[in-house]
Amino acid sequence: MFSPDDVKKYRDELGIKEHNDSTIKKDFFDFLEERDYSLSYKMPFMLAFINNINTIGDAEIDKVLDEYIKFYQDRIDRGLQVDRRTCPYNEKMLKDKKAICKNMLANPFEKFERKRFLYYSKDLSIISMNHALFSQMTKEDWKRIRTQMQEDLRNYYSEMGGV
């Protein structure tokens, strides 16, 4: 293994930022600001998650999943394009909660999990926000996330019939 001095040396040489509990909030908002949307999944997922998060940073996966599905089903019900052509979501698939849950956990959830912002407990059926991140969040931060996700959805769907 590397000594702490070696880690710092290589981190400096390679330009690798340190990621820890003191940087997690900035890391999270930097990640959101990247606006990396090959498909729309991150936006309705994050909105569903923050709409269902409780006072300790947990959200029941079934509630998140129901709201996530509702977003796409609403688009179908209104005769709007669900997403880009590569998106597998259609009327039939949206009725298969198990398939949608598997897809949601693979993408977009996994993108948040890989960076340690969110965790999933299959046994508890809970998606949790990293507690260091959750403890630093303010009302303004939640509003900022909601506003950005709604704006990003409007921009994303601007050429697909709107949100």
Spans of features found by a protein language model:
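Intrinsically disordered, charged low-complexity linkers and terminal tails
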Residues: M1-V163
